[in-house]
Amino acid sequence: MTSGKNGITYAEAGVDIDAGNALVDRIKPAAKRTNRPGVASGLGGFGALFDLKAAGYQDPVLVAATDGVGTKLRIAIDTGLVDGVGIDLVAMCVNDLVCQGAEPLFFLDYFATGKLETDTAARIIEGIAEGCVQSGCALIGGETAEMPGMYPAGDFDLAGFAVGAMERGTALPEGVVEGDVLLGLASNGVHSNGYSLVRKLVEISGNTWESDCPFGDGKLGQALLTPTRLYVRQVLAAIRAGGVHALAHITGGGLTENLPRVLPEGMGATIDLDTWDLPPVFGWMAETGGIAEAEMLKTFNCGIGMIVVCAADRAEALAELLSAEGETVARIGTVTTTPGIAYTGKLL
């Protein structure tokens, strides 16, 4: 057995345990900010504990979701603007959870890189914590994997895992009928899907991340890194108010493919494209790439990040409630008995 001053260390193989420990110490205050009723352990254990009774549940059903941020990370890595991608990660998971009618309870992250850069990792995880605070769920654990030889210098990847709960018998979708109203909640841009196409369009346009933004203020890279909106608190308030029959998070697949996922078999919807304002980024992308309207609608959110399907006699009250919660709400269509999505009006 080799020992003494000539022995090889783990650090010499590319894994810095001390850096990992320093990261945990730095992010503990951020994680602590996310504590909520039900959290029964802190960071550092072999597992994290959560007490559903302490969270107020009597007969809970658990709901789980996992997701990533996709190639939006490439822009964050190239620009060094990593602070918002943690919010993206949380949003992609918890916005899905709430579509089942569940309240997000806790979140875990997976951060992988070739060489751990403590400041970069801390900024990302602090963003994750901010996303958790905004959506009312606790950051109760995670994994930081330093894997030499697996990633180019400076690169990293992220995955998130969220668990929520609802009382038995309250799951969505439920009760969707012909004539139900579609309330569209505004997005703030591209959110976190379609970025392989976005990056191709930037290349075609001859711009760089440091170019002045052609569709708004500031630099192009910064504009494209606007964090995904979190809809959890607002939508949960609408669910509790009554009349919500289904929710659709508009991510990959756009309006065309995501709304049918929450409609009963044999049903569809009409959507009036003239009922909301298209964020400028989508017009720029369509023009730059000569992208057809139908392709835009099945790729991007096109300005609607979440659809609330509700009873017609509750639509006005729910729109007012959601507006009071800070949402920009548009009445964009209705449920029909014709399968698929039929569009009227003009997007572009």
Swiss-Prot record:
Known EC number? 6.3.3.1
One GO biological process term: adenine biosynthetic process
Catalysis: reaction(s) = 2-formamido-N(1)-(5-O-phospho-beta-D-ribosyl)acetamidine + ATP = 5-amino-1-(5-phospho-beta-D-ribosyl)imidazole + ADP + phosphate + H(+)
* Major subcellular site: cytoplasm
According to the UniProt record, what class of enzyme is this? ligase
Select a single GO molecular function from the record's annotations and give it.
phosphoribosylformylglycinamidine cyclo-ligase activity
Going by the entry's taxonomy, the superkingdom of the source organism is recorded as Bacteria
- Where does this protein act, in terms of pathway? Purine metabolism; IMP biosynthesis via de novo pathway; 5-amino-1-(5-phospho-D-ribosyl)imidazole from N(2)-formyl-N(1)-(5-phospho-D-ribosyl)glycinamide: step 2/2
Family, as annotated: Belongs to the AIR synthase family.
The record's listing under HAMAP family reads:
AIRS
Protein name, UniProt field:
Phosphoribosylformylglycinamidine cyclo-ligase
Q: Which organism is it from?
A: Ruegeria pomeroyi (strain ATCC 700808 / DSM 15171 / DSS-3) (Silicibacter pomeroyi)
